[in-house]
Amino acid sequence: MTIQQTPEELAQEVKRLVSQLQAQGRNDLLLRAIGVPLLEELRIEAAKGKLSRLVITKDYRFILVDYNNKEVELQPVHKAVYLLFLAHPEGIEFKRLADYREELTRYYMATAKMLDKEKIIEGIDHLVNPLDNAIHEKCSRIKKVFLDMMDEYTASYYYISGHTQKRFAGSSRIWYERLKIITLPRDLVSRLELFEETGIVFGEETEV
């Protein structure tokens, strides 16, 4: 009769096997056994203890509630870009931003209520133009703001970063999507109420 091991016992067995592989210098086999997707899940799980919930208020203030309610100071255009990437955890290629023009415009109009509509449209034109450097500049600014607030490892979950994904078509065609994503687990993103202007909904309602 086989005695079923408890999760804790299985964890100890895994730890023992990992130690044996590392002692033999075979991290390559360890990585192959774990797999990259699981490795990323483990990385996120390990970081959760350091990550703060991000609360987006009804007037589009970005608050890190677990870091003493620190506010992420961003201009309306940066907030609009950030909201777009938050809404698409699957990632977006910069060269395809024009496909998200309408959605990005809604976010910008919601975050920049005092700005003239023509100025908003002009700003969107720059952002979705693949020959313009505007989106790179905005993402660099967002990255700097988070780096100024926390260490680089923690900040990497909050800012917009690159992720290359291998794609297959049939038996011979292979191509790569160069996606830009925010890796922050979406269960850490909350809102104080539904965003009626944009239709965007993140996580659960919470209080600051």
Model-derived features with residue positions:
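Short, flexible coil/linker elements and helix-boundary hinge sites characteristic
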Residues: 25-26, 35, 49-50, 112, ...
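Short, solvent-exposed loop/helix junctions and linker helices
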Residues: 71, 75, 129-136
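DNA-binding patch around the recognition helix
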Residues: 40-51, 134, 139-197
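Short amphipathic alpha-helical recognition elements used for nucleic-acid or partner binding
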Residues: 70-121, 142
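Short boundary/linker motifs that mark transitions into or out of structured domains
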Residues: 30-83, 88, 189, 195
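Long, compositionally biased intrinsically disordered regions
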Residues: 1-40
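Extended catalytic cores and adjacent scaffolds of nucleotide/polyanion-binding enzymes
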Residues: 196-208
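Intrinsically disordered, low-complexity acidic Ser/Thr-rich regulatory segments
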Residues: 115-133
